[in-house]
Swiss-Prot record:
Pfam family, one: GlnD_UR_UTase
Name of the encoding gene: glnE
Keywords for the protein's UniProt record, in alphabetical order: ATP-binding, Magnesium, Multifunctional enzyme, Nucleotide-binding, Nucleotidyltransferase, Transferase
Protein name in the entry: Bifunctional glutamine synthetase adenylyltransferase/adenylyl-removing enzyme
Region (Adenylyl removase): 1-458
Lineage: Bacteria, Pseudomonadati, Pseudomonadota, Betaproteobacteria, Burkholderiales
Source species: Ralstonia nicotianae (strain ATCC BAA-1114 / GMI1000) (Ralstonia solanacearum)
Segments forming a coiled coil: none
Length: 955
C-alpha cells in the first residue's frame, strides 16, 4: 500500500496562472494560490506574519485554545459577540496555516483533516461553554426528571466530522441530544429541558454559521437528525431510540456509522450518555446477522446521488458559460460523480454494514482504516485497497485545493482556464491535461472497484421463470410446467410441482415483503435450473425448498444469494452432494457467507490465526456472555463448513478431515476455557491449573462432523478452594459447549470416562488420577479404562498438566501384563459391546459387527497394552493404522496381514464417512460389499484372540 506523502507545489511558484505577489518569506504558497488568503492578508496588517508563525508546525489543540483565549479577550465585547468574533478570526488563521503547510508539502492529508476536525470540536465546545453560561444565568441548569442530575447537551458529529476526516471548507453535520426530560432549576425563568436544549442548539448554530464581517466558522447542517428539518432541533435519547425502531431508514444507518460524540466526553454524565447512545445506535446500524440487503440499498442510494451530482455539474457548467474543458465529459464532481470520494466511502461502508454486527473490529470510522480492516479479513484484496487508498488521498488533496482557492465548499473542477492551470499546479502537475489524465486513471480504478462490489448480478430472464410464475393451480398451465420439468430432467415432475405449489401458497411466502418476494421468486427459478444440472434433480430441488423455507424470513440471506450467483451454484453443489451438509447449511444459513471466499474454500486452516481472530472477537464482546457463546459457535460452524466444502469437492480424504476437525475442537476448547474462567466468580487465581483430556474419537484424532466429545477434567492445585472452584468451572464449561443459543450448539459432551464413571467426581486432582490409573489403593482403574488410555491425549488447558498426563499415560501403558488374563478381559469387553449394539438387519455394520472397526480397535489396544513394556513406540497415540503397521514391523503380528487390516480400517472409515454425509445414522452396507475386508479383520482377531465363536463374555 502506498505510504502517505505530502504534496508540494514549490516548483510551480510565480506562474502566470497565479497573479499574486511574488513569493517571499511570508506565506509564499498560500498567497500564490489562494485568492481567499490573499484577501485576508490584504485586509489586516501583520496577519500574514502571525499565520506564518502558526504554520511553522502542526496545529494543536493547545495552540487553538491559547490563540482563542487571546482573540476572545481582544474582542472586548459581550461574551457571545466575543465568541463569534474570536472563532471566526481563529478559523481564518487555521485555514491559511493549513493551506500553507499543505501546499508547501509540510503536512500530510491526515494532518490537515485532523486539524480541521480538532478545530470543529474545539469551536463547538467553546460555543457551548460561553452560551451555556449565559443561558444558565437566565434559566438555570437542566435537571433530569428521573436522576435528579444536571443534564448536558450532547452533540454528535456525523459524516466527515465524526470520522475525523473534515475538509478545509466543509460544513459540519450535527445532531443535538440530551439524556432525560425535566426542567431547569436555579434560574429566574425556568424552561423544560427540551426548550432549554433547543434554545442552546439554535444559538450554537448561530455562533458557528452566521456570516459576519469576519466571515463564518462552519456551515451547520442539521438535516441528519430524526425527521430531518421537520423534526425537533434537539431530541432525547428515548425519542431517538423510538425513531430508529419505528421510522429509521436505510440511509440513516450509513450516516450513523460515523456518528461520534464531539462534546467533552470526560464528565461522568457524558460518559454515561455515550454508553447509552451506543446501546441505542449499535443495533440500528449493525444488524445481528450478516446483512447483504445493504448492497441493493446502497446501489439505489448511489444512483440517486450520482444523478443529483450530474444535475449540479450541468448547472455549474451553464453558470460558467459552458467552458469546453476536456474534463467535463468525464466527472467534474470529484466527490459525488463517477469514481469519486463517495464511491470509495460506499465500498468501505458496505463491509461494515454487512458484517459489523458480528465483527466488532469493523465498527470504526475513518474510511482508510475500514478498508485496511476489510483487507486484513480477506473481504477485499490488498491490491484493491492500495489502489483505493491512493485514489482517496489524491481526490481528498484535490478537494482541498479546489477549496483553498476561494474558501468555497466545492467539489467541481473549475471551468475557467486560469483556474484549471492554478489547480493543476497546486496538485504538482505542469498543466491541466496532466492532472485530468491522472484523475481519470484514479476515477476509473475507483469506479471499477465500485461496480465489482455493487453491480446488479441478477438474471434478466431466469431459465425456469415460466414454471414458478405459472398459476400452479391452473390445470392447463400446470401441465405446461410439468412438461418443462420433465424436459429439464426431473424424474417425478408431479411431486416437484406439488412442493412448488405448497411453497408458493404457504403463509410464509405470502408474509414476505414485496422486495423479499421478488428475491425469493428469482432464487426459486435459479434453484430449478441448478438442480436440473445435478444427477438427482428431484432430491436436490427438495433440499433447496427445505433450505429456502428455513431462510425466507431472513431477507439478508435472500439478498446474498441474489447478489452473488456464484454462491447459489455452490449451494446447489452442497445440497446435492450430501444430505448431512444440506441439513447443516439449513440449520446454520449464516454459513452462506463462507461460499463467497474462493481462496478460503481451498486454503489449509491456520489454527494460530483462528485462535487470534476468535480471541479478539471474544475480547471485543466484553462481558456479553450470550454474544461470546454465539461467537464461538459462529466461528466453529464456519470452520467446520470450510472443511466440509473441501471434503465435498474431493480435496480431502477422511484422515486429514478428522485431523482438521480434531484440531478445530482443540482450538475451540482452549478458547472456551479461557473465556469461561473469567465467568467463574469464585476463581482464586489468574490462570487456572486445569486441563482437559480427550478420549475416544477426539483423543485419537478421528473426529467426525457430528461426533460427541469424550472428555475428562484434571486439576493440580492444592488450594483448599480448588475442588469446588474447578467443579464449578467444569460444569460451566460443559454448559457453554452444549447449550443451544441463537447460533446453535458446539458439541455434545460425554464425561463418563472419568474415574468411577458417572458416579465419580466431575473433576479429579491429578495425584488422585495417577493413583487410580496406577492401581495404588482400593479404587483402581479397570482394564477397559487402560484400553481407553491408548488413544487419550491432553487437548486444552494447562500444558504442564498435559505433559504430566502424557508421562502418566505412557507409564500406565508400559506396565507389564500377562497375556492370558488381558486377552480374556478384552475379549469379554468386546462381547459386551457387541451385545449393546445388536444389528437386526442383514446389512454389515461397519463399526460394530464382527470383522468391523471395533474388532480392529480392540486388537490394537490389546497389542499396545501387552507389548508396550518392551516396545515404547507402541505408546504413541498415532492412530490405529500406524499402530497396526508398527506391530507388523515389530513382528508382533503378521506384517502382510497387518497391512491388509490397516487398509480395511481405512476403507471402513471412508465408507462410514460417506454414509454419515448421506444422512445415515447407522453405518451399514450390504454384507457382500466388504466381505473381503471383514475376512482379513476376523483372521487377525483369531490370530490374536483365538476363535471368535469361542469367545464369550465373562460373568
Amino acid at each position: 500500500m502506498t505510504a502517505q506523502a505530502p504534496l508540494s507545489v514549490a516548483p510551480f511558484l510565480q506562474t502566470p496562472a497565479c497573479p499574486s505577489e511574488a513569493p517571499g518569506a511570508v506565506l509564499p504558497f498560500s498567497l500564490n494560490y489562494s485568492r481567499y488568503v490573499q484577501r485576508l492578508a490584504q485586509a489586516r496588517a501583520g496577519w500574514a506574519e502571525r499565520v506564518q508563525a502558526a504554520a511553522a508546525g502542526p496545529i494543536s489543540v493547545a495552540w487553538l485554545s491559547a490563540r482563542f483565549g487571546e482573540l476572545f479577550e481582544a474582542a472586548a465585547a459581550e461574551p457571545e459577540q466575543a465568541l463569534k468574533r474570536a472563532l471566526r478570526l481563529l478559523r481564518n488563521e487555521v485555514f491559511a496555516a493549513l493551506a500553507e503547510r499543505d501546499l508547501s508539502g509540510a503536512a500530510t492529508l491526515d494532518e490537515v483533516t485532523g486539524a480541521m476536525t480538532d478545530f470543529a470540536e474545539f469551536a463547538v465546545r467553546a460555543a457551548i461553554a460561553v452560551i451555556g453560561q449565559e443561558l444558565g444565568a437566565l434559566h438555570g441548569q437542566p435537571v433530569g426528571q428521573s436522576s435528579g442530575e444536571v443534564q448536558e447537551l450532547v452533540v454528535v458529529g456525523m459524516g466527515k466530522l465524526g470520522g475525523r476526516e473534515l475538509n478545509v471548507s466543509s460544513d459540519i453535520d450535527l445532531i443535538f441530544l440530551y439524556d432525560e426530560e425535566g426542567d431547569t432549576q436555579g434560574g429566574p425563568r425556568p424552561l423544560s429541558n427540551h426548550e432549554y436544549f433547543t434554545k442552546l442548539g439554535r444559538r450554537l448554530i448561530n455562533a458557528l454559521a452566521d456570516v459576519t464581517e469576519d466571515g463564518y466558522v462552519f456551515r451547520v447542517d442539521m438535516r441528519l437528525r430524526p425527521n430531518g428539518d421537520a423534526g425537533p432541533l434537539a431530541c432525547s435519547l428515548g425519542m431517538l431510540e423510538e425513531y430508529f425502531v419505528v421510522q429509521g431508514r436505510e440511509w440513516e444507518r450509513y450516516a450513523w456509522i460515523k456518528g461520534r460524540v464531539i462534546t467533552d466526553p470526560g464528565s461522568p454524565h457524558a460518559a454515561r450518555v455515550i454508553q447509552q447512545l451506543e446501546r441505542v445506535t449499535t443495533p440500528f446500524v449493525f444488524r445481528r446477522y450478516l446483512d447483504y440487503g445493504v448492497i441493493a440499498a446502497i446501489r439505489a442510494l448511489h444512483a440517486q446521488i450520482r444523478a443529483e451530482a450530474a444535475k449540479r455539474s450541468n448547472a455549474a457548467n451553464r453558470q460558467h458559460g459552458g467552458h469546453d474543458s476536456q474534463v467535463q465529459a468525464h466527472a467534474p464532481n470529484i466527490k459525488l460523480g463517477r469514481g469519486g470520494i463517495r464511491e470509495i466511502e460506499f465500498v468501505a461502508q458496505v463491509f461494515q454494514l454487512i458484517r459489523g454486527g458480528q465483527d466488532f473490529g469493523l465498527r470504526i470510522r475513518p474510511t482508510l482504516e475500514v478498508l485496511r480492516a476489510a483487507a486484513e479479513r480477506g473481504l477485499i484484496g490488498a491490491d484493491a485497497v492500495a489502489r483505493l487508498t491512493d485514489a482517496y488521498r489524491f481526490l481528498r488533496q484535490l478537494e482541498h485545493r479546489l477549496q483553498y482557492v476561494d474558501d468555497a465548499q466545492t467539489h467541481n473542477l473549475p471551468g475557467a482556464p486560469e483556474d484549471q492551470l492554478r489547480i493543476a499546479r497546486m496538485m504538482g502537475f505542469a498543466d491541466y491535461a496532466a492532472l485530468v489524465a491522472q484523475l481519470e486513471r484514479y476515477q476509473d480504478e475507483v469506479a471499477q472497484q465500485f461496480e465489482q462490489t455493487f453491480s446488479d448480478k441478477q438474471d434478466n430472464q431466469p431459465p425456469c421463470a415460466a414454471i414458478w410464475h405459472a398459476d400452479l393451480l391452473d390445470d392447463e398451465r400446470t401441465e405446461s410446467a410439468r412438461a418443462q420439468l420433465l424436459e429439464l430432467g426431473y424424474a417425478d415432475a408431479d411431486s416437484v410441482l406439488e412442493r412448488l405449489r405448497a411453497s408458493r401458497h404457504s403463509p410464509r411466502y405470502r408474509a414476505l415483503s414485496e422486495v423479499s418476494r421478488q428475491r425469493f421468486d428469482l432464487l426459486i427459478n435459479r434453484a430449478l435450473d441448478h438442480a436440473a444440472r445435478q444427477t438427482d434433480a428431484d432430491v436436490t430441488i427438495a433440499r433447496f425448498l427445505d433450505f429456502f423455507d428455513a431462510i425466507s424470513r431472513r431477507s439478508s440471506y435472500l439478498s446474498l444469494l441474489s447478489e452473488y450467483p456464484q454462491a447459489m451454484a455452490r449451494v446447489a453443489h452442497t445440497l446435492h452432494a450430501s444430505r448431512w451438509a444440506a441439513d447443516y447449511l439449513t440449520r446454520h444459513p449464516q454459513l452462506l457467507d463462507e461460499l463467497l471466499d474462493t481462496e478460503a474454500l481451498s486454503a489449509a486452516p491456520d489454527w494460530q490465526g483462528f485462535r487470534e481472530r476468535v480471541r479478539e472477537r471474544l475480547r471485543a464482546a466484553g462481558d456479553h456472555v450470550e454474544m461470546q457463546m454465539d461467537i464461538l459457535r459462529q466461528e466453529h460452524h464456519a470452520e467446520t463448513f470450510r472443511i466440509l466444502l473441501q471434503d465435498l469437492q474431493g480435496m480431502l480424504t477422511v484422515e486429514p478431515i478428522s485431523d482438521r476437525l480434531s484440531d478445530l475442537a482443540d482450538a475451540v476448547l482452549d478458547l472456551t476455557l479461557e473465556t469461561v474462567w473469567q465467568q467463574v466468580s469464585t476463581r482464586h487465581r489468574e490462570v487456572p491449573r486445569f486441563a482437559v483430556v480427550a478420549y475416544g474419537r477426539l483423543g485419537g484424532k478421528e473426529l467426525g462432523y457430528a461426533s460427541d466429545l469424550d472428555l475428562i477434567f484434571l486439576y493440580d492445585d492444592d488450594d483448599e478452594r480448588a475442588p469446588e472452584v474447578y467443579a464449578a468451572y467444569a460444569r460451566k464449561l460443559i454448559t457453554w459447549l452444549t447449550s443451544h443459543t441463537a447460533a446453535g450448539m458446539l458439541f455434545d459432551v460425554d464425561t463418563r470416562l472419568r474415574p468411577n464413571g458417572a458416579a465419580g467426581l466431575m473433576v479429579t486432582h491429578f495425584e488422585a488420577f495417577r493413583r487410580y490409573q496406577m492401581r495404588e489403593g482400593d479404587n483402581a482403574a479397570w482394564v477397559w479404562e487402560h484400553q481407553a488410555l491408548t488413544r487419550a491425549r491432553f487437548c486444552a488447558g494447562d500444558p504442564e498438566i498435559g505433559a504430566r498426563f502424557e508421562a502418566l499415560r505412557i507409564a500406565v501403558l508400559r506396565q507389564p501384563r500377562e497375556a492370558g488374563p488381558l486377552r480374556d478381559e478384552i475379549a469379554a469387553m468386546r462381547e459386551r459391546v457387541l451385545e449393546g449394539h445388536a444389528n437386526p438387519t442383514p446389512l454389515f455394520d461397519l463399526k460394530h459387527d464382527r470383522g468391523g472397526m471395533v474388532d480392529i480397535e480392540f486388537t490394537v489396544q490389546f497389542l499396545v497394552l501387552l507389548h508396550s513394556a518392551a516396545y515404547a513406540e507402541l505408546t504413541r497415540n498415532a492412530g490405529n493404522i500406524a499402530l497396526l503397521r508398527m506391530a507388523g514391523e515389530l513382528g508382533l503380528i503378521d506384517a502382510a496381514r497387518a497391512a491388509r487390516v490397516a487398509d480395511a480400517y481405512r476403507d471402513f472409515r471412508a465408507r462410514q464417512h460417506k454414509l454419515r454425509l448421506d444422512g445415515q445414522s447407522a453405518a451399514r452396507v450390504p454384507a457382500g460389499t466388504c466381505a473381503h475386508e471383514a475376512a482379513h479383520v476376523r483372521a487377525l482377531w483369531e490370530q490374536v484372540f483365538g476363535s471368535i465363536d469361542a469367545a464369550s463374555p465373562t460373568p
